[in-house]
Amino acid sequence: MANYFNTLNLRQQLAQLGKCRFMGRDEFADGASYLQGKKVVIVGCGAQGLNQGLNMRDSGLDIAYALRKEAIAEKRASWRKATENGFKVGTYEELIPQADLVVNLTPDKQHSDVVRSVQPLMKDGAALGYSHGFNIVEVGEQIRKDITVVMVAPKCPGTEVREEYKRGFGVPTLIAVHPENDPKGEGMAIAKAWAAATGGHRAGVLESSFVAEVKSDLMGEQTILCGMLQAGSLLCFDKLVEEGTDPAYAEKLIQYGWETITEALKQGGITLMMDRLSNPAKLRAYALSEQLKTIMAPLFQKHMDDIISGEFSSGMMADWANDDKKLLTWREETGKTAFETAPQYEGKIGEQEYFDKGVLMIAMVKAGVELAFETMVDSGIIEESAYYESLHELPLIANTIARKRLYEMNVVISDTAEYGNYLFSYACVPLLKAFMTEIQPGDLGKAIAEGAVDNAQLRDVNEAIRGHAIEKVGQKLRGYMTDMKRIAVAG
């Protein structure tokens, strides 16, 4: 199989990369009705599989889970989760032939095997659904021409998909129809009904393409969402300890600091995050972020280039074939870092203290978000897609670090995201070594003293922060998410 994106000519590539339309709420007036009375079979019962299924059932759809024979016979976790929640469970052979929509929610590396198994069993004219387009775009999976291929991609972990639905809300979602597989022209109707059944229409839906979703998703998770948080955690912890900070305090400042400062990001973008700082600290954070952007821009561009060309995917798939040797080695090495093994701090850190003593961390967030956004847009990805894959998901990933440090982040994210995270962080840490030697008192671990600032300089910095394209598109998109649940910040 050939990488689908690389089979397209330049005009087709640009058209698919740039496909992005914010859909009106009136387009979802029919809710999930298009799928009501039809049989939906989900393959895989992980975080996305279970939680999407729960939402879809609560929206009135007929949901069942198809699992491998051995998973059922051995009563594995997937079987237990599905049966404990009252779902019908059966083998591929028992359930797939009757399905009107088969939703493949297994991990990326299993997609080819799953599709190879279910496709011969699918009835003529059925639909195949994904929540990530890697198998179609990067692997180049060929699907029977009578089958409609659609995608509904919630921009949150599966647990959040469920929690927001239970609150009567939802999470922002991308939907798409594979242009090579829409024989009856019903792909968009299926995708809209599926998105409505998960609650995504209440938080905003982007009509996208498989290509745009994959390329932007890979870029976001490798750089700002996971790679920058991992590199920043390791660099900042080592710097604090080197400067004499108690390792336990340093660990807590970083572990919970990302979550606390990105909660402001979630509610009001980079503008609000920077407004939590004193004027002198804001000017310093801005200056640091500009330095970081200059240093890291080539690394961000390399990741985007390797994603566009398929170099990243081919390298990762080679590691799949080698029993994940690189991935598992990197995972083990990360678990042995000083940050991961530091003792816990039992004292309290106030919310504002995370901002006041985390100026460098704020600068890293600002630089990473803006660089990821800018690099995606420069590559032909529309601003709305770039926003969701950079700024929007960051607080959710930061929340995983607050639970159990980098270990938890790497457990929760997909293996694809984890592999890309290590590629980025292993390159970023040495890249920023020299920069870290120039850190001043007040940048990290100590607050910058209050003092006078130049009015004109402060005005210019405020205008630069608020005038960035991600702030403009973010203000519009956050307007659809006014009911977002607030992440509890640590003490």
From Swiss-Prot:
* Protein's pathway: Amino-acid biosynthesis; L-isoleucine biosynthesis; L-isoleucine from 2-oxobutanoate: step 2/4; Amino-acid biosynthesis; L-valine biosynthesis; L-valine from pyruvate: step 2/4
Q: Which cofactor does it need?
A: Mg(2+)
Presence of the UniProt keyword Transmembrane helix in the record: no
Catalyzed reaction equations? (2R)-2,3-dihydroxy-3-methylbutanoate + NADP(+) = (2S)-2-acetolactate + NADPH + H(+); (2R,3R)-2,3-dihydroxy-3-methylpentanoate + NADP(+) = (S)-2-ethyl-2-hydroxy-3-oxobutanoate + NADPH + H(+)
**Residues that bind NADP(+):** C45, G46, A47, Q48, R68, R76, S78, D108, K109, Q110, G158
What molecular function does GO assign, one term?
ketol-acid reductoisomerase activity
Which Pfam families does the record cross-reference, listed alphabetically? KARI_C, KARI_N
Query: Which residues are Mg(2+) 2-binding?
Result: D217, E389, E393
Which part of the chain is the KARI C-terminal knotted domain?
Answer: 209-344, 345-484
Example GO biological process term? Answer: isoleucine biosynthetic process
Instruction: Specify the signal sequence span.
Output: none
How is the co-factor bound, per the entry? Binds 2 magnesium ions per subunit.
User: Which InterPro entries does this entry report, sorted A to Z?
Assistant: 6-PGluconate_DH-like_C_sf, 6PGD_dom2, KARI, KARI_C, KARI_N, NAD(P)-bd_dom_sf
Show where the KARI N-terminal Rossmann domain sits. 15-208
Annotated residues for binding of substrate: S414
Instruction: Identify which residues the record assigns to the active site.
Output: H132
Q: Which UniProt keywords apply?
A: Amino-acid biosynthesis, Branched-chain amino acid biosynthesis, Magnesium, Metal-binding, NADP, Oxidoreductase, Repeat
Question: What EC number(s) does its UniProt record assign?
Answer: 1.1.1.86
Task: Mention any one GO cellular component term assigned to this protein in its UniProt record.
Answer: cytosol
Q: Does the keyword Ion transport apply?
A: no
The highest taxon in the source lineage is: Bacteria
SUPFAM superfamilies xref list: 6-phosphogluconate dehydrogenase C-terminal domain-like, NAD(P)-binding Rossmann-fold domains
**Annotated HAMAP family:** IlvC
| Record-stated family | Belongs to the ketol-acid reductoisomerase family.
What function is annotated for this protein?
Answer: Involved in the biosynthesis of branched-chain amino acids (BCAA). Catalyzes an alkyl-migration followed by a ketol-acid reduction of (S)-2-acetolactate (S2AL) to yield (R)-2,3-dihydroxy-isovalerate. In the isomerase reaction, S2AL is rearranged via a Mg-dependent methyl migration to produce 3-hydroxy-3-methyl-2-ketobutyrate (HMKB). In the reductase reaction, this 2-ketoacid undergoes a metal-dependent reduction by NADPH to yield (R)-2,3-dihydroxy-isovalerate.
Report the protein name in the record.
Ketol-acid reductoisomerase (NADP(+))
